[in-house]
């Protein structure tokens, strides 16, 4: 198959990187092209070894299409066509070398402005290219919106990464299958690690600007992480790996992690993990005895290597993945919106940490079958390409 991937962020978000890597590992020997938002950054993390990287956007001259979109913006305030114009040349160039186009930004329907993804879906359709919404999570109330439901039905296939989204999309009448997030399929890559991983138990911690942005009580998320670190230092002998998973300039996990590191006077039990590729981060996380994470794909790196994990989440993806892995999300996901008192994350940690051996055994038993479900999506894509 000739597969084009689009709608994804660049690899400085290592979740975006992990989706591409996991997709290639799942689907195997095909021709891959990525319509990249930042070819240089994607190449920096090695994605050019897996796929041809093509700029997703091109500067548009002021042709009729530009003038029409500009008029629509000025008259109606609708900027979707104006934004979408810059993607059209790359999409039109895909016609001769694409069997399937995968929209791989799994969170794209979580953050508003879904109209641009409907625009891109239609743009591929005009080139007679079948589209697949790949590894997605969408809040059921968003799926229920008529415009979203209509858009979802225009995909040849929707591959939902958890059951909450699957049921909502199925009810909307779209062609849908349920698969694990493609990042579950990405293999870790061994790398050099801090020597403290060899000398002591290590608990991994990830915090993100995103959960701080989504908190309802200002300062609650950071205060809870700070209290958790203090608890671990007072009540265990474990070292703590402060682990970034997104390093974009405007959304950089290293900023709150470095603040935590400094707030504890760079205590020798704290490991400030540097930036790595997604497979290397997965390897580092796999060496933790327990993981507390905010970034979805940091927690997937933990889950998929059998590491007991507490998720500080804010959306359907965290709830749905935990429900599919454990049968429920309560106790496994702490919604950041609910944080009020500074000890809530610590209490949730204590509850899971006490059960860590049983959780690890459960993950090790069920993960092979869970990940194997992804094979259904591979077969579905092959059938679409042949149809």
Give the ranges of each region predicted by the language model.
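Active-site anion-handling motifs in enzyme catalytic cores
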Residues: 1-387
